[in-house]
Every structure is written in structure tokens, then in C-alpha cells.
Amino acid sequence: RQDIIAGIALYRPGPMDFIPKYLEGKNNRDSVTYDCPQLIPILEPTYGCIVYQEQVMQIVRDLAGYSLGRSDLLRRAMSKKKQAVMEKERQSFVYGNREEGVKGCIKNGISEEIANKIYDEMIDFAKYAFNKSHAAAYGVVAYQTAYLKYYYAAEFMAATLNSYLGNLDKAPQYIDECKRLGIQILKPDINKSFEKFTVEVNKSEAV
């Protein structure tokens, strides 16, 4: 279940860069490294990779002393690519902001170089990242559709083709998929055909 959720969250333009590292860590936990000890409880479940928006929020809270509210504001700024806000927050993340009650990484024993490296990774990651609940919701849909395709392949493919009627790019791809699955595509029949794709069960399933 967690693999499905992580797979969906990783397959995005920002987190996608972490896929090789994630797979290597999953297959060989000894290869997983962390830039500082404070990251271990946050990133251990995802093999040292930032996968979810919630992890960004936890990183800035645990490493730099952000409040819950401020960590969410940073998450929003990153996702909306607000460059001025992100650069201002970099200063707070690395060096702290006494007036606003942010300790900063350096006071927590994290070097300036490592703090900036972590912040750069968070910016690259957060541009198109999902929160975990969002990825989980998509995961449920993926699980359900995989079940339907496996156990009710003809019905599933008929419904899929109906959703792409008139789409000259997608429909041929799904017709090829029917052939790969061993499902016949029948020609129109004035005595049997309907307005849309339907399933005909005879000696073998056909659409």
C-alpha cells in the first residue's frame, strides 16, 4: 500500500528526480544516507528521499524551529514558486529569525553548507509535489482500476474506450491494449452493435 502511494507521489516533475535514489534505498537500505541526523526520523520511511509535502513541513520544523503555520506558508510559497518568499525563508531556515521566533539550522548544530543543500533540495522537490493524502486518494483509484482491469478486463477496456470516443490519439492505444490482453475488437454489426463499445461474451470475450 505504501509503495503505491509513494510511487504516485514520486511520479511528478519535482520528486521524479528522486526515483533512482528511492529505488536504490528500497533495494539496499545500506545505501541510504542522510545529510544530518535530524532527517533520519523524517526520511527513513522513504529511504532518505523527500516524497511528500508533509516531509518538507516537518523538516523546517525539526531542523529550523518553524511553527506549524509558518511551515505551511513555506510549503505554499514553494508550490507556487514565489521566489522572493523562498529566498527570504532561506535566510530564516539557515540562520534563524529572532524577531519571528525561528531558531534556524545553525543553532541546531547543522552547518551552513548542509542547511543550504537541504533547502535547495526542498525547493526542487516542492514545485509539483503532492501531499500524502492526495497521493493516497489517487492510490485508491489506481488499486481499484487495477483490480477491475485484471478481473473484468473486457468490461474495463470497453468503458475505457467509451471515455475516449473520437480521440484519434488515445483510442488506437487502447485498441492495441485490448489485442495485447487477448480481447477481440469486433467490427460494427447492424444486428448487434450499440452506440458505444459493449462486451460480447461468446467463446471468448470481445469488445
Which functions belong to the PLM regions below?
Residues 1-207:
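Noncatalytic, beta-rich nucleic-acid-contacting surfaces in large DNA/RNA-processing enzymes
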